Amino acid sequence: MTHSAILGSKTYNQYFPKLTPGQLAENGKIKVIVGMSGGVDSSVSAFILQQQGYQVEGLFMKNWEEDDDTDYCTAAADLADAQAVCDKLGIRLHKINFATEYWDNVFEHFLSEYKAGRTPNPDILCNKEIKFKAFLEYAAEDLGADYIATGHYVRRSGPDHDAHLLRGLDNNKDQSYFLHALSKKQVGQSLFPVGEVEKTVVRAVAEELGLITAKKKDSTGICFIGERKFKDFLARFLPAQPGDIKTTEGEVIGRHQGLMYHTLGQRKGLGIGGIKGKDENAWYVVEKDLKNNVLVVAQGHDNSALQSSGLIAKQLTWVSEQPLRKTLHCTVKTRYRQTDIACEVVPVNDDTVEVHFDEPQIAVTPGQSAVFYQGEECLGGGIIETQIK
Protein backbone atom coordinates (compact mmCIF):
# COMPACT_ATOMS: atom_id res chain seq x y z
CA MET A 1 0.00 0.00 0.00
CA THR A 2 1.52 3.31 -1.01
CA HIS A 3 1.30 6.47 1.06
CA SER A 4 -1.01 7.97 -1.52
CA ALA A 5 -3.64 5.38 -0.71
CA ILE A 6 -3.90 7.17 2.63
CA LEU A 7 -3.65 10.66 1.16
CA GLY A 8 -6.96 11.93 -0.15
CA SER A 9 -8.18 14.97 -2.05
CA LYS A 10 -11.81 15.98 -2.35
CA THR A 11 -10.95 18.23 -5.29
CA TYR A 12 -9.23 15.35 -7.09
CA ASN A 13 -12.35 13.18 -6.73
CA GLN A 14 -14.49 16.01 -8.06
CA TYR A 15 -12.43 16.71 -11.21
CA PHE A 16 -10.95 13.37 -12.22
CA PRO A 17 -12.96 10.35 -13.38
CA LYS A 18 -13.02 7.35 -11.07
CA LEU A 19 -11.39 4.38 -12.76
CA THR A 20 -12.81 0.86 -12.64
CA PRO A 21 -10.82 -1.91 -10.89
CA GLY A 22 -10.07 -3.29 -14.36
CA GLN A 23 -8.63 0.03 -15.58
CA LEU A 24 -6.57 0.39 -12.40
CA ALA A 25 -5.18 -3.13 -12.85
CA GLU A 26 -4.25 -2.38 -16.49
CA ASN A 27 -2.52 0.86 -15.48
CA GLY A 28 -0.71 -1.05 -12.73
CA LYS A 29 1.36 -2.78 -15.41
CA ILE A 30 2.57 0.57 -16.77
CA LYS A 31 5.60 2.42 -15.41
CA VAL A 32 5.60 6.21 -15.63
CA ILE A 33 8.59 8.41 -14.78
CA VAL A 34 7.48 11.91 -13.77
CA GLY A 35 9.82 14.84 -14.33
CA MET A 36 9.83 16.30 -10.81
CA SER A 37 10.91 19.94 -10.95
CA GLY A 38 10.15 20.84 -7.36
CA GLY A 39 7.07 22.79 -8.48
CA VAL A 40 3.38 22.30 -7.78
CA ASP A 41 2.41 21.08 -11.27
CA SER A 42 4.79 18.11 -11.37
CA SER A 43 3.98 17.29 -7.72
CA VAL A 44 0.26 17.01 -8.44
CA SER A 45 0.96 15.17 -11.72
CA ALA A 46 2.70 12.42 -9.73
CA PHE A 47 -0.28 12.15 -7.36
CA ILE A 48 -2.83 12.00 -10.22
CA LEU A 49 -0.92 9.16 -11.91
CA GLN A 50 -0.73 7.27 -8.62
CA GLN A 51 -4.47 7.62 -8.16
CA GLN A 52 -4.91 6.24 -11.66
CA GLY A 53 -3.01 3.10 -10.65
CA TYR A 54 0.26 3.56 -12.55
CA GLN A 55 3.66 2.53 -11.18
CA VAL A 56 5.09 5.99 -10.55
CA GLU A 57 8.65 7.13 -9.91
CA GLY A 58 10.14 10.63 -10.08
CA LEU A 59 13.21 11.93 -11.90
CA PHE A 60 14.82 15.26 -11.02
CA MET A 61 17.16 16.66 -13.62
CA LYS A 62 19.81 19.28 -13.20
CA ASN A 63 20.56 21.24 -16.37
CA TRP A 64 22.81 24.01 -15.17
CA GLU A 65 26.02 24.00 -13.12
CA GLU A 66 25.93 27.00 -10.83
CA ASP A 67 29.38 28.24 -9.98
CA ASP A 68 29.04 31.18 -7.63
CA ASP A 69 25.44 31.72 -8.58
CA THR A 70 23.77 30.10 -5.61
CA ASP A 71 21.78 33.27 -4.94
CA TYR A 72 20.11 32.93 -8.30
CA CYS A 73 19.90 29.24 -8.92
CA THR A 74 17.19 27.46 -7.03
CA ALA A 75 18.31 23.93 -7.97
CA ALA A 76 19.15 22.84 -4.41
CA ALA A 77 15.85 24.12 -3.00
CA ASP A 78 13.92 22.61 -5.91
CA LEU A 79 15.56 19.22 -5.35
CA ALA A 80 14.70 19.36 -1.64
CA ASP A 81 11.06 20.17 -2.50
CA ALA A 82 10.89 17.38 -5.09
CA GLN A 83 12.32 14.93 -2.54
CA ALA A 84 9.84 16.04 0.14
CA VAL A 85 6.91 15.53 -2.26
CA CYS A 86 8.15 12.08 -3.33
CA ASP A 87 8.62 11.09 0.32
CA LYS A 88 5.07 12.19 1.10
CA LEU A 89 3.65 10.27 -1.87
CA GLY A 90 5.86 7.28 -1.10
CA ILE A 91 7.60 7.20 -4.47
CA ARG A 92 11.24 6.91 -5.41
CA LEU A 93 13.11 9.95 -6.75
CA HIS A 94 15.96 9.43 -9.22
CA LYS A 95 18.41 12.21 -10.10
CA ILE A 96 20.24 12.92 -13.34
CA ASN A 97 22.61 15.65 -14.51
CA PHE A 98 22.10 16.88 -18.06
CA ALA A 99 24.24 20.03 -17.73
CA THR A 100 26.59 18.98 -20.55
CA GLU A 101 23.75 18.16 -22.96
CA TYR A 102 22.03 21.41 -22.00
CA TRP A 103 25.14 23.48 -22.64
CA ASP A 104 25.82 21.81 -26.00
CA ASN A 105 22.27 21.60 -27.36
CA VAL A 106 20.49 24.58 -25.82
CA PHE A 107 22.81 27.18 -24.34
CA GLU A 108 25.37 27.40 -27.18
CA HIS A 109 22.49 27.88 -29.62
CA PHE A 110 20.95 30.53 -27.34
CA LEU A 111 24.22 32.52 -27.37
CA SER A 112 24.76 32.20 -31.12
CA GLU A 113 21.21 33.47 -31.77
CA TYR A 114 21.82 36.50 -29.55
CA LYS A 115 25.11 37.13 -31.35
CA ALA A 116 23.19 37.10 -34.64
CA GLY A 117 20.84 39.78 -33.31
CA ARG A 118 17.85 37.49 -32.82
CA THR A 119 15.82 36.87 -29.66
CA PRO A 120 15.67 33.10 -29.09
CA ASN A 121 13.38 31.10 -26.82
CA PRO A 122 15.56 28.57 -24.97
CA ASP A 123 12.58 26.88 -23.26
CA ILE A 124 11.33 25.55 -26.59
CA LEU A 125 14.72 24.07 -27.41
CA CYS A 126 15.06 22.66 -23.88
CA ASN A 127 11.75 20.83 -24.24
CA LYS A 128 12.73 19.44 -27.63
CA GLU A 129 16.34 18.47 -26.84
CA ILE A 130 16.37 17.79 -23.10
CA LYS A 131 13.00 17.08 -21.46
CA PHE A 132 11.47 15.12 -24.31
CA LYS A 133 14.70 13.68 -25.69
CA ALA A 134 17.63 13.18 -23.26
CA PHE A 135 15.23 12.81 -20.30
CA LEU A 136 12.81 10.59 -22.22
CA GLU A 137 15.61 8.32 -23.47
CA TYR A 138 17.14 8.01 -19.99
CA ALA A 139 13.73 7.25 -18.43
CA ALA A 140 12.97 4.57 -21.04
CA GLU A 141 16.40 2.95 -21.35
CA ASP A 142 17.82 3.25 -17.83
CA LEU A 143 14.70 3.33 -15.67
CA GLY A 144 12.41 1.10 -17.74
CA ALA A 145 9.66 3.69 -18.26
CA ASP A 146 6.73 3.03 -20.58
CA TYR A 147 5.91 6.76 -20.49
CA ILE A 148 7.26 9.95 -19.05
CA ALA A 149 4.97 12.60 -17.55
CA THR A 150 5.47 16.32 -16.97
CA GLY A 151 3.51 19.11 -15.31
CA HIS A 152 2.92 20.99 -18.56
CA TYR A 153 -0.51 22.47 -19.27
CA VAL A 154 -1.16 20.68 -22.55
CA ARG A 155 -3.30 17.71 -23.57
CA ARG A 156 -2.82 14.88 -26.01
CA SER A 157 -5.29 12.87 -28.03
CA GLY A 158 -5.13 9.82 -30.25
CA PRO A 159 -3.21 6.56 -29.87
CA ASP A 160 0.48 6.51 -28.94
CA HIS A 161 1.58 5.87 -32.53
CA ASP A 162 -0.44 8.81 -33.88
CA ALA A 163 -0.62 11.29 -31.02
CA HIS A 164 -1.87 14.86 -31.39
CA LEU A 165 -0.89 17.81 -29.19
CA LEU A 166 -3.73 19.98 -27.86
CA ARG A 167 -3.84 23.20 -25.87
CA GLY A 168 -4.17 22.85 -22.09
CA LEU A 169 -7.70 23.16 -20.77
CA ASP A 170 -6.70 26.24 -18.73
CA ASN A 171 -6.40 28.83 -21.47
CA ASN A 172 -4.51 31.13 -19.15
CA LYS A 173 -1.82 28.54 -18.47
CA ASP A 174 -1.69 26.69 -21.80
CA GLN A 175 1.94 25.77 -22.61
CA SER A 176 1.53 24.25 -26.07
CA TYR A 177 3.52 27.20 -27.47
CA PHE A 178 6.61 25.82 -25.67
CA LEU A 179 5.98 22.20 -26.70
CA HIS A 180 5.15 22.80 -30.37
CA ALA A 181 8.51 21.40 -31.56
CA LEU A 182 7.76 17.89 -30.25
CA SER A 183 7.08 15.11 -32.74
CA LYS A 184 4.04 12.84 -32.50
CA LYS A 185 6.45 10.12 -31.31
CA GLN A 186 7.55 12.28 -28.37
CA VAL A 187 3.96 13.28 -27.56
CA GLY A 188 2.91 9.61 -27.78
CA GLN A 189 5.46 8.64 -25.12
CA SER A 190 4.32 11.37 -22.73
CA LEU A 191 1.45 11.98 -20.31
CA PHE A 192 0.26 15.42 -19.19
CA PRO A 193 -1.97 14.87 -16.15
CA VAL A 194 -2.62 18.53 -15.22
CA GLY A 195 -3.41 19.58 -18.79
CA GLU A 196 -6.99 18.39 -18.26
CA VAL A 197 -7.76 20.84 -15.42
CA GLU A 198 -7.30 24.47 -14.41
CA LYS A 199 -4.40 25.70 -12.30
CA THR A 200 -6.70 26.52 -9.36
CA VAL A 201 -7.67 22.83 -9.20
CA VAL A 202 -3.99 21.81 -9.12
CA ARG A 203 -3.27 24.19 -6.24
CA ALA A 204 -6.36 22.98 -4.35
CA VAL A 205 -5.28 19.33 -4.69
CA ALA A 206 -1.76 20.20 -3.46
CA GLU A 207 -3.23 22.08 -0.46
CA GLU A 208 -5.49 19.17 0.49
CA LEU A 209 -2.56 16.75 0.30
CA GLY A 210 -0.42 19.07 2.41
CA LEU A 211 2.33 19.16 -0.23
CA ILE A 212 5.24 21.50 0.45
CA THR A 213 4.89 22.91 -3.08
CA ALA A 214 1.20 23.90 -2.71
CA LYS A 215 1.90 27.63 -2.36
CA LYS A 216 5.20 27.75 -4.25
CA LYS A 217 5.13 30.44 -6.90
CA ASP A 218 5.41 29.46 -10.56
CA SER A 219 8.86 29.76 -12.04
CA THR A 220 9.10 32.48 -14.64
CA GLY A 221 11.80 33.60 -17.00
CA ILE A 222 14.62 31.55 -18.40
CA CYS A 223 15.63 28.66 -16.16
CA PHE A 224 19.40 29.25 -16.22
CA ILE A 225 19.09 32.95 -15.47
CA GLY A 226 16.73 32.71 -12.53
CA GLU A 227 15.97 36.02 -10.84
CA ARG A 228 19.15 37.83 -11.84
CA LYS A 229 19.32 40.71 -14.28
CA PHE A 230 19.30 39.41 -17.83
CA LYS A 231 21.76 42.08 -18.95
CA ASP A 232 24.36 41.10 -16.33
CA PHE A 233 24.00 37.44 -17.22
CA LEU A 234 24.41 37.96 -20.95
CA ALA A 235 27.43 40.24 -20.45
CA ARG A 236 29.32 37.34 -18.85
CA PHE A 237 29.19 35.36 -22.09
CA LEU A 238 28.97 37.91 -24.90
CA PRO A 239 30.98 41.14 -25.15
CA ALA A 240 28.66 44.12 -25.54
CA GLN A 241 29.17 46.57 -28.39
CA PRO A 242 27.66 49.99 -27.68
CA GLY A 243 26.37 52.03 -30.61
CA ASP A 244 23.95 54.72 -31.76
CA ILE A 245 20.19 54.85 -31.36
CA LYS A 246 18.67 56.45 -34.48
CA THR A 247 15.17 57.39 -35.56
CA THR A 248 13.73 55.91 -38.75
CA GLU A 249 14.76 59.22 -40.38
CA GLY A 250 18.40 58.57 -39.42
CA GLU A 251 18.71 61.15 -36.62
CA VAL A 252 20.97 60.04 -33.71
CA ILE A 253 19.03 60.50 -30.45
CA GLY A 254 20.95 58.31 -27.99
CA ARG A 255 23.33 55.40 -27.36
CA HIS A 256 22.64 51.73 -26.73
CA GLN A 257 24.82 49.38 -24.65
CA GLY A 258 24.56 46.50 -27.11
CA LEU A 259 21.96 45.37 -29.67
CA MET A 260 21.61 42.00 -27.92
CA TYR A 261 19.97 43.69 -24.93
CA HIS A 262 17.07 44.90 -27.06
CA THR A 263 14.14 43.26 -28.78
CA LEU A 264 11.68 44.49 -31.42
CA GLY A 265 8.70 46.31 -29.96
CA GLN A 266 10.59 47.10 -26.74
CA ARG A 267 9.62 50.36 -25.08
CA LYS A 268 11.22 50.40 -21.63
CA GLY A 269 14.91 50.68 -20.88
CA LEU A 270 15.91 52.64 -23.98
CA GLY A 271 17.18 55.61 -21.98
CA ILE A 272 15.62 58.12 -24.38
CA GLY A 273 12.75 60.46 -23.72
CA GLY A 274 11.91 64.13 -23.55
CA ILE A 275 13.88 64.86 -26.72
CA LYS A 276 13.83 68.45 -27.89
CA GLY A 277 11.51 69.03 -30.79
CA LYS A 278 9.81 65.61 -30.42
CA ASP A 279 6.34 64.95 -29.03
CA GLU A 280 5.74 62.96 -25.85
CA ASN A 281 4.86 59.65 -27.55
CA ALA A 282 6.85 56.65 -26.31
CA TRP A 283 9.73 55.31 -28.40
CA TYR A 284 9.76 51.71 -29.61
CA VAL A 285 12.49 49.54 -31.11
CA VAL A 286 11.59 48.89 -34.76
CA GLU A 287 14.85 47.48 -36.14
CA LYS A 288 18.26 46.15 -35.10
CA ASP A 289 20.74 47.13 -37.82
CA LEU A 290 23.51 44.60 -37.20
CA LYS A 291 25.75 45.73 -40.03
CA ASN A 292 26.05 49.25 -38.62
CA ASN A 293 25.38 48.34 -34.96
CA VAL A 294 22.46 50.78 -34.84
CA LEU A 295 19.24 50.49 -32.87
CA VAL A 296 16.40 52.03 -34.89
CA VAL A 297 13.43 53.48 -32.99
CA ALA A 298 10.11 55.12 -33.85
CA GLN A 299 7.44 56.90 -31.84
CA GLY A 300 3.96 55.64 -31.05
CA HIS A 301 2.50 52.20 -30.48
CA ASP A 302 0.61 52.28 -33.78
CA ASN A 303 3.57 53.45 -35.86
CA SER A 304 3.59 51.66 -39.21
CA ALA A 305 7.31 50.87 -38.73
CA LEU A 306 6.29 48.51 -35.90
CA GLN A 307 3.74 46.63 -37.99
CA SER A 308 4.07 43.67 -40.29
CA SER A 309 1.59 41.95 -42.57
CA GLY A 310 3.25 38.57 -42.15
CA LEU A 311 6.47 36.66 -41.57
CA ILE A 312 8.81 34.08 -43.01
CA ALA A 313 9.54 31.11 -40.73
CA LYS A 314 12.22 28.44 -41.10
CA GLN A 315 13.47 25.37 -39.15
CA LEU A 316 9.93 24.01 -39.24
CA THR A 317 8.74 21.19 -37.05
CA TRP A 318 5.31 19.58 -37.43
CA VAL A 319 3.89 17.36 -34.69
CA SER A 320 2.56 15.05 -37.42
CA GLU A 321 6.12 14.79 -38.82
CA GLN A 322 4.61 15.51 -42.28
CA PRO A 323 5.85 18.64 -44.10
CA LEU A 324 3.25 21.13 -45.27
CA ARG A 325 2.42 20.59 -48.94
CA LYS A 326 -0.42 23.04 -49.55
CA THR A 327 -1.65 26.39 -48.27
CA LEU A 328 -3.10 26.16 -44.78
CA HIS A 329 -5.69 28.45 -43.19
CA CYS A 330 -5.19 28.40 -39.43
CA THR A 331 -4.13 30.64 -36.54
CA VAL A 332 -0.65 31.54 -35.35
CA LYS A 333 0.98 32.87 -32.18
CA THR A 334 4.23 34.80 -32.60
CA ARG A 335 4.85 34.91 -28.85
CA TYR A 336 3.58 33.18 -25.71
CA ARG A 337 0.24 34.34 -24.26
CA GLN A 338 -0.68 36.15 -27.46
CA THR A 339 -4.23 35.96 -28.79
CA ASP A 340 -4.35 33.71 -31.85
CA ILE A 341 -3.94 35.54 -35.16
CA ALA A 342 -5.92 34.28 -38.17
CA CYS A 343 -3.54 33.65 -41.05
CA GLU A 344 -2.67 31.82 -44.24
CA VAL A 345 0.46 29.64 -44.25
CA VAL A 346 2.08 29.10 -47.65
CA PRO A 347 4.82 26.45 -47.99
CA VAL A 348 7.91 27.71 -49.84
CA ASN A 349 9.83 24.46 -49.35
CA ASP A 350 9.94 21.76 -46.65
CA ASP A 351 11.83 24.05 -44.31
CA THR A 352 10.30 27.47 -45.04
CA VAL A 353 6.81 28.97 -44.94
CA GLU A 354 5.37 32.39 -45.65
CA VAL A 355 2.69 33.45 -43.18
CA HIS A 356 0.19 36.16 -44.14
CA PHE A 357 -1.85 37.66 -41.29
CA ASP A 358 -5.50 38.62 -41.77
CA GLU A 359 -4.71 41.85 -39.84
CA PRO A 360 -1.32 43.62 -39.44
CA GLN A 361 0.56 42.73 -36.23
CA ILE A 362 3.13 44.58 -34.16
CA ALA A 363 6.51 43.45 -32.86
CA VAL A 364 7.00 40.26 -34.86
CA THR A 365 10.45 39.27 -33.59
CA PRO A 366 13.09 37.26 -35.51
CA GLY A 367 14.39 34.33 -33.43
CA GLN A 368 11.07 33.83 -31.65
CA SER A 369 8.76 30.98 -32.62
CA ALA A 370 5.67 31.16 -34.81
CA VAL A 371 3.34 28.39 -33.62
CA PHE A 372 0.37 27.17 -35.66
CA TYR A 373 -3.03 26.01 -34.39
CA GLN A 374 -6.15 24.50 -35.87
CA GLY A 375 -8.77 25.03 -33.18
CA GLU A 376 -7.55 23.23 -30.06
CA GLU A 377 -4.77 21.38 -31.86
CA CYS A 378 -1.18 22.61 -31.93
CA LEU A 379 0.20 21.69 -35.36
CA GLY A 380 3.83 22.74 -34.93
CA GLY A 381 5.83 25.82 -35.81
CA GLY A 382 9.10 27.38 -36.87
CA ILE A 383 11.59 30.12 -36.08
CA ILE A 384 10.72 33.61 -37.32
CA GLU A 385 13.38 34.58 -39.87
CA THR A 386 12.05 37.97 -41.01
CA GLN A 387 8.92 40.07 -41.02
CA ILE A 388 6.93 40.75 -44.16
CA LYS A 389 6.15 44.46 -44.10
From Swiss-Prot:
<dbReference type="GO" id="GO:0103016">
    <property type="term" value="F:tRNA-uridine 2-sulfurtransferase activity"/>
</dbReference>
<feature type="active site" description="Cysteine persulfide intermediate">
    <location>
        <position position="223"/>
    </location>
</feature>
<feature type="binding site">
    <location>
        <begin position="35"/>
        <end position="42"/>
    </location>
    <ligand>
        <name>ATP</name>
    </ligand>
</feature>
<dbReference type="InterPro" id="IPR023382">
    <property type="entry name" value="MnmA-like_central_sf"/>
</dbReference>
<feature type="site" description="Interaction with tRNA">
    <location>
        <position position="368"/>
    </location>
</feature>
<dbReference type="Pfam" id="PF03054">
    <property type="entry name" value="tRNA_Me_trans"/>
</dbReference>
<dbReference type="InterPro" id="IPR046884">
    <property type="entry name" value="MnmA-like_central"/>
</dbReference>
<keyword id="KW-0819">tRNA processing</keyword>
<keyword id="KW-0067">ATP-binding</keyword>
<dbReference type="Pfam" id="PF20258">
    <property type="entry name" value="tRNA_Me_trans_C"/>
</dbReference>
<dbReference type="Pfam" id="PF20259">
    <property type="entry name" value="tRNA_Me_trans_M"/>
</dbReference>
<keyword id="KW-0808">Transferase</keyword>
<keyword id="KW-0963">Cytoplasm</keyword>
<dbReference type="GO" id="GO:0005524">
    <property type="term" value="F:ATP binding"/>
</dbReference>
<feature type="active site" description="Nucleophile">
    <location>
        <position position="126"/>
    </location>
</feature>
<dbReference type="InterPro" id="IPR004506">
    <property type="entry name" value="MnmA-like"/>
</dbReference>
<keyword id="KW-0547">Nucleotide-binding</keyword>
<dbReference type="InterPro" id="IPR046885">
    <property type="entry name" value="MnmA-like_C"/>
</dbReference>
<feature type="site" description="Interaction with tRNA">
    <location>
        <position position="152"/>
    </location>
</feature>
<keyword id="KW-0694">RNA-binding</keyword>
<feature type="region of interest" description="Interaction with target base in tRNA">
    <location>
        <begin position="121"/>
        <end position="123"/>
    </location>
</feature>
<feature type="disulfide bond" description="Alternate">
    <location>
        <begin position="126"/>
        <end position="223"/>
    </location>
</feature>
<comment type="function">
    <text>Catalyzes the 2-thiolation of uridine at the wobble position (U34) of tRNA, leading to the formation of s(2)U34.</text>
</comment>
<dbReference type="GO" id="GO:0000049">
    <property type="term" value="F:tRNA binding"/>
</dbReference>
<keyword id="KW-1015">Disulfide bond</keyword>
<feature type="region of interest" description="Interaction with tRNA">
    <location>
        <begin position="173"/>
        <end position="175"/>
    </location>
</feature>
<feature type="region of interest" description="Interaction with tRNA">
    <location>
        <begin position="335"/>
        <end position="336"/>
    </location>
</feature>
<feature type="binding site">
    <location>
        <position position="61"/>
    </location>
    <ligand>
        <name>ATP</name>
    </ligand>
</feature>
<dbReference type="GO" id="GO:0005737">
    <property type="term" value="C:cytoplasm"/>
</dbReference>
<protein>
    <recommendedName>
        <fullName>tRNA-specific 2-thiouridylase MnmA</fullName>
        <ecNumber>2.8.1.13</ecNumber>
    </recommendedName>
</protein>
<dbReference type="InterPro" id="IPR014729">
    <property type="entry name" value="Rossmann-like_a/b/a_fold"/>
</dbReference>
<feature type="binding site">
    <location>
        <position position="151"/>
    </location>
    <ligand>
        <name>ATP</name>
    </ligand>
</feature>
<dbReference type="GO" id="GO:0002143">
    <property type="term" value="P:tRNA wobble position uridine thiolation"/>
</dbReference>
<comment type="similarity">
    <text>Belongs to the MnmA/TRMU family.</text>
</comment>
<keyword id="KW-0820">tRNA-binding</keyword>
